[in-house]
């Protein structure tokens, strides 16, 4: 299995303590003032990966039972947490009304950061870090939530659900007009990524058509001129979603490792 190195933030104890205090107070302000997008399920109290999945499956099942086709696209950011520009993060912190004290701390927290690679007994030169929320920190996920919080505002009247950096844009399909509208949502999302220096990964963005119809409506969606592939199943947050919403493929994937283990024991 390919191993991807994970950066380790080096911060002193006092900094970590202040970070946790600021993270806690920031989330309280965001939640009490209803600043965060309603359907953002990541890194929030009483909202989890499970709540996001249940919400989507319930919605898709309802539409399917009503004989309504739902087209959806799962959008993945390329390098997600590593792409967030520091100066623009501070700007959004100000935009959402955080105190000047908190803004000063965030500015200091993100400024003058460097990274280095240690391999065995060799250490590389330090390189300045001007983007990316520090992973492994209490503030990192909150800064990311704040940064992508206005994505749904670009997609006016859209249907979008988020779990941190995983975005699902969807729409019930009745006529060709709905398909064209969904394509407009995708283009609005592209405008957001260009405005805020982020990037979606077109090769990992697929279209799933959830329907009970024998002859579902077809439309060729695209991002950056890249024709999106229509798939019959997609793995999302640990579950396998089929276009007919059956669970046999997910069940097989979950039980297959145990089956292989039994074969080894034999």
Task: Kindly give the residue locations of the regions a language model identified.
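Basic, alpha-helical interaction scaffolds
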Residues: 156, 226-266
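Inter-domain linker/hinge segments that demarcate the starts of reverse transcriptase
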Residues: 21-26, 52-64, 179-196, 261-263
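Active-site palm subdomain of RNA-directed nucleic acid polymerases
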Residues: 22-40, 141-170
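Short, conserved micro-motifs composed of acidic
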Residues: 184, 199-233
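Catalytic palm subdomain of template-directed nucleic-acid polymerases
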Residues: 79-96, 167-194, 247
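Catalytic palm active-site di-aspartate
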Residues: 6, 40, 70-81, 132-136, ...
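Conserved pre-catalytic core of RNA-dependent polymerases
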Residues: 1-134
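Hydrophobic (often cysteine-bearing) scaffold residues that line and stabilize catalytic clefts
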Residues: 10, 14-19, 52, 85-86, ...
């Amino acid at each position: 299995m390919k191993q991807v190195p994970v950066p380790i933030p080096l911060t002193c104890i006092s900094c970590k303590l202040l970070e946790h205090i600021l993270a806690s107070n920031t989330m309280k302000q965001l939640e009490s003032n209803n600043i965060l997008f309603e359907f953002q399920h990541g890194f929030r109290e009483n909202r989890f990966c499970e709540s996001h999945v249940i919400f989507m499956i319930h919605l898709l099942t309802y539409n399917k039972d009503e004989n309504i086709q739902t087209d959806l696209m799962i959008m993945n950011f390329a390098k997600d947490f590593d792409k967030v520009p520091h100066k623009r993060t501070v700007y959004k912190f100000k935009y959402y009304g955080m105190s000047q004290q908190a803004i000063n701390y965030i500015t200091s927290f993100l400024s003058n950061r460097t990274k280095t690679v240690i391999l065995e007994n060799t250490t590389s030169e330090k390189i300045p870090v001007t983007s990316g929320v520090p992973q492994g920190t209490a503030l990192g996920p909150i800064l990311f939530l704040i940064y992508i919080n206005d994505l749904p505002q670009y997609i006016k009247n859209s249907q979008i659900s988020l779990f941190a950096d995983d975005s699902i844009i969807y729409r019930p399909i009745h006529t060709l007009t709905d398909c064209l509208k969904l394509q407009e949502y995708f283009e609005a999302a592209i405008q957001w990524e260009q405005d805020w220096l982020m990037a979606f990964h077109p090769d990992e963005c697929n279209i799933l058509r959830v329907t009970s119809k024998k002859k579902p409506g077809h439309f060729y969606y695209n991002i950056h001129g890249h024709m999106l592939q229509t798939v019959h199943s997609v793995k999302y947050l640990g579950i396998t979603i089929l276009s007919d919403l059956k669970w046999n493929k997910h069940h097989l994937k979950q039980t297959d490792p145990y089956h292989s283990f039994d074969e080894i024991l034999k």
